[in-house]
Each structure stands twice: as structure tokens, then as C-alpha cells.
């Protein structure tokens, strides 16, 4: 299986990489939070742009991206607008969503973008091609905050992302029971062993699913999300605790 290298970070080998989400509402808070995050132990900075209030002003969005790039130049920067239908803060049109991601790609300020699988097949394929033309990696994602589908469906979605040339397919699902967590882990393992030719990221959310955020190296998930301050999704634990557990499992 091939790995994905962003800056000096190799994703898809060794212990799962830690992603943290920054969710500031304006440029001043982007700056102050970036300074606070700089001291934390993580691998990838995800900027959750759906929390940014001045979204209609692309110049303002890119000014904030520039602050993040300058504050943490060594950290890979993942640009993510999470749609309302997949658990994000704001709803925008598909056209606006694609335009925002295109602006991020063209800016040269971001290393990776998050593209939601169910945005529309043609739009997703075009955005992936655009990203790759600018040497920007694509995390293609799907989130369900209500349920966990059958393992076959989980695998089908991850394989579809792979077929759309995503660099890293990602899926996050809400368990209604502990057996749902096992379904997610079994699907991850089957995907990793039988179909994946690149790193994947999977997680089961909430307290019930916490084990999935810790056991990625065992089952085949290449990265996990931790919290520096406020968690961006239910079930995230602090980056310090996360690094400790990931290291213990890696060295065992």
C-alpha cells in the first residue's frame, strides 16, 4: 500500500497521525488559537472553515489561512468546510462549496482539502483533478451522525472514494450500540486488507466509539482526531492522552 507524504509527514505507516481541528469564528480568534495550538503535540492542523463567520468574503478566508500557514509553517494544513448535512456549522450551495475549495487550492496556502463524497460525482472528480494539479492532497469524507450502516456499505463508500482518486478516504459514523463499533472496525480491517491501496481514516464516534480512535494501527486507520481545546466531534480525547495511548500501542 502506498503512503501519502505531506511536508515531512508520512501518512499510512507507523502509529496513526493526530489531526486537530481549529474552529475559530473570526481572524482575531484564528490568530490567538493558532498561537495556542502551536504548543500542542499533533501532526496535522485541520481548519474547520464552516465555523468562520465571514465566509462570503474569500479574501478574508484566505487571510485567515495565511495566518495559520505563517504561525505553523511546518504543520500540514487541512482545509475543511464541513457541510451542515454532515454535521457542520453552516449550509452553503454546492457551487459555493466547490468555489471555496477551489480558492483554497489556488491560494497555495493549504496542503490538503477535505471533499465530501456526496457533494456530487462530477463536482468531486473535477475538484480532485484541480487539487492534484496544484499538488494539494485530498481527504475525501463521509459522516453520519445518526447511524452506522452495514460493513458492506462502509466498504463501498471507501472504495468509491478511492475510485475517485482521493488520496485518503475517510469515514466517521455514529454507533447506536457497541456492535456498531465492531462493524466499523471490521469494515476498516476488510478494506485495509482487501481493497485499500492508500491510507484510510475511519472512526466510530461518541464515547461508545472511543476505542476506534485509539486502535487505528491495529485495524487499519492511518489517522485520528484529538482535541487541543474543544472537541470538534463527540468522542475526541485530548492530544496528550491520545499520543500516549497511540505510542503504547505502537511500541507494544
From Swiss-Prot:
Superkingdom of source: Bacteria
Reaction(s) catalysed (UniProt annotation): 3-dehydroquinate = 3-dehydroshikimate + H2O
Protein's pathway: Metabolic intermediate biosynthesis; chorismate biosynthesis; chorismate from D-erythrose 4-phosphate and phosphoenolpyruvate: step 3/7
Pfam families reported in the protein's UniProt record: DHquinase_I
Keyword Nucleotide-binding: no
GO MF term (any one): 3-dehydroquinate dehydratase activity
Subunit structure and binding partners: Homodimer.
Function: Involved in the third step of the chorismate pathway, which leads to the biosynthesis of aromatic amino acids. Catalyzes the cis-dehydration of 3-dehydroquinate (DHQ) and introduces the first double bond of the aromatic ring to yield 3-dehydroshikimate.
Protein name: 3-dehydroquinate dehydratase
Organism per entry: Shigella boydii serotype 18 (strain CDC 3083-94 / BS512)
The organism's taxonomic lineage, starting at the top: Bacteria, Pseudomonadati, Pseudomonadota, Gammaproteobacteria, Enterobacterales
Amino acid at each position: 500500500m502506498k503512503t501519502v507524504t505531506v511536508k515531512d509527514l508520512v501518512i499510512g505507516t507507523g502509529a496513526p497521525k493526530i489531526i486537530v481541528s481549529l474552529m475559530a469564528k473570526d481572524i482575531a480568534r484564528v490568530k490567538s488559537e493558532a498561537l495556542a495550538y502551536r504548543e500542542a503535540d499533533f501532526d496535522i492542523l485541520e481548519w474547520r472553515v464552516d465555523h468562520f463567520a465571514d465566509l462570503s468574503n474569500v479574501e478574508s478566508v484566505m487571510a485567515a489561512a495565511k495566518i495559520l500557514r505563517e504561525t505553523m509553517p511546518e504543520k500540514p494544513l487541512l482545509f475543511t468546510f464541513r457541510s451542515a448535512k454532515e454535521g457542520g456549522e453552516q449550509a452553503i450551495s454546492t457551487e459555493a462549496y466547490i468555489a471555496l475549495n477551489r480558492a483554497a487550492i489556488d491560494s497555495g496556502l493549504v496542503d490538503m482539502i477535505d471533499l465530501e463524497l456526496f457533494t456530487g460525482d462530477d463536482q468531486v472528480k473535477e475538484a480532485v483533478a484541480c487539487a492534484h494539479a496544484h499538488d494539494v492532497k485530498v481527504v475525501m469524507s463521509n459522516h453520519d451522525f445518526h447511524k452506522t450502516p452495514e460493513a458492506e456499505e462502509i466498504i463501498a463508500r471507501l472504495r468509491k472514494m478511492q475510485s475517485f482518486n482521493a488520496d485518503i478516504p475517510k469515514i466517521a459514523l455514529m454507533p447506536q450500540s457497541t456492535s456498531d463499533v465492531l462493524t466499523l472496525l471490521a469494515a476498516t480491517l476488510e478494506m485495509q486488507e482487501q481493497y485499500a491501496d492508500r491510507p484510510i481514516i475511519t472512526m466510530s464516534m461518541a464515547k461508545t466509539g472511543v476505542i476506534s480512535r485509539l486502535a487505528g494501527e491495529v485495524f487499519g486507520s492511518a489517522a485520528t482526531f484529538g482535541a487541543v481545546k474543544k472537541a470538534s466531534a463527540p468522542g475526541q480525547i485530548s492530544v496528550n492522552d491520545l499520543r500516549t495511548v497511540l505510542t503504547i500501542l505502537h511500541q507494544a
